[in-house]
């Protein structure tokens, strides 16, 4: 967890504040999720273990500092297990890293500011896809693996931030049957409804399963006090079985989330942070030194500093 964390740099002091202490609308920095929804901080997930199915994962410091809360990792695609692969992320790791840290991160890299709603939650991570695809049948296999390992890791929650390849009735779809079986086994299954709000009535398994708690989204512009709460592009029912989904909507945009180390995005963020701290005299030299990192800055680097 030493090298490769440069892009997960510590967050400076929080967003701008008005004289009365409220969030200053001039600041683009979003408030932490807990502040935005008025979460009760006494509920931290302590003693609870949740499993996550996603395309890949990374052992982010917010999950491993001061001690790891990742109890197990299983790669369904290769059959490999053990925590060591989490130290070497690839491009497929970003989505699961974000979903797990947003759900269970303790804010270690932001001095606790951007901690999740469940900073003490234990995790079991199961990779069920690649960067390009998460297949319907692989999600089903992942749910089956969680059921088989429920007692071993005391799994009480299953989060699925992926969806199947097609609409299907929960009465005869294999993935849907596994999701129902997980609930019968005592696991609370939660699934994202999907991002097909442009296609009404399109909800795929596992989000379409009656026993699954399905979650959609809203956009509060980063702060509810702005008074600009709008709908997100979430999918919505009725499902192919005539069921209304989702059951819950919550924040889906302006979510403080980590960036995967050693990726083009992480290098761009490091450059922007360096420029933010630099004096006017230092900025041209920094831009020349990091040419090729971020195309918009390459195009603008010969302009006067005050125009950047």
Task: State the predicted function of each range.
Residues 2-6, 10, 16, 108, ...:
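Generic secondary-structure signature for well-ordered alpha-helical cores
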Residues 2-52, 62, 80-94, 228-237:
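N-terminal domain-start motif of subtilase-like serine proteases
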Residues 38-74, 81-137, 153-156, 184, ...:
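Subtilisin-like serine protease catalytic core
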Residues 54, 74, 78, 207-308:
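Extracellular S/T/G-rich loop segment that most often corresponds to the catalytic His/Ser-adjacent loop
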Residues 64-68, 172-175, 204-207, 229-230, ...:
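Short, glycine/charged-enriched secondary-structure capping and boundary segments
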Residues 102-106, 142-149, 182-185, 275-282, ...:
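Structured segments of extracytoplasmic/periplasmic soluble domains
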Residues 128-211, 222, 240-243, 296-307:
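Substrate-binding/access-modulating region of protease and related hydrolase catalytic domains
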């Amino acid at each position: 967890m030493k090298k490769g964390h440069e892009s997960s740099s510590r967050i400076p002091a929080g967003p701008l504040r008005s004289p009365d202490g409220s969030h200053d609308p001039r600041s683009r920095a979003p408030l932490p999720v807990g502040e935005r929804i008025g979460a009760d901080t006494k509920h931290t997930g302590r003693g609870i273990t949740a499993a996550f199915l996603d395309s890949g994962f990374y052992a982010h410091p917010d999950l491993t500092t001061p001690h790891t809360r990742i109890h197990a990792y299983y790669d369904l695609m290769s059959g490999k297990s053990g925590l060591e692969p989490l130290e070497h992320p690839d491009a497929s790791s970003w989505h699961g890293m974000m979903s797990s840290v947003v759900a269970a991160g303790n804010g270690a890299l932001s001095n606790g500011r951007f901690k999740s709603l469940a900073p003490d939650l234990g995790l079991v991570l199961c990779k069920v896809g690649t960067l390009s695809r998460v297949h319907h049948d692989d999600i089903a296999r992942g749910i089956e693996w969680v059921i088989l390992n429920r007692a071993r890791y005391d799994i009480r929650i299953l989060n699925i931030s992926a969806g199947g390849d097609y609409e299907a009735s929960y009465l005869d779809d294999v993935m849907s049957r596994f999701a129902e079986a997980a609930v019968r086994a005592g696991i609370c299954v939660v699934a994202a409804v999907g991002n097909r709000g442009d296609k009404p009535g399109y909800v795929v398994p596992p989000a379409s399963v009656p026993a699954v708690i399905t979650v959609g989204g809203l956009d509060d512009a980063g702060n509810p006090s702005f008074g600009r709460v709008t709908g997100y592009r979430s999918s919505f029912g009725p499902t192919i079985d005539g069921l209304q989904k989702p059951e819950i909507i919550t924040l889906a945009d302006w979510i403080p989330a980590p960036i995967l180390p050693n990726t083009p995005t992480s290098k761009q963020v490091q450059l922007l942070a360096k420029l933010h701290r630099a004096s006017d005299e230092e900025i041209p030299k920094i831009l020349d030194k990091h040419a090729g990192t971020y195309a918009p800055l390459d195009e603008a680097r010969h302009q006067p500093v005050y125009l950047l």
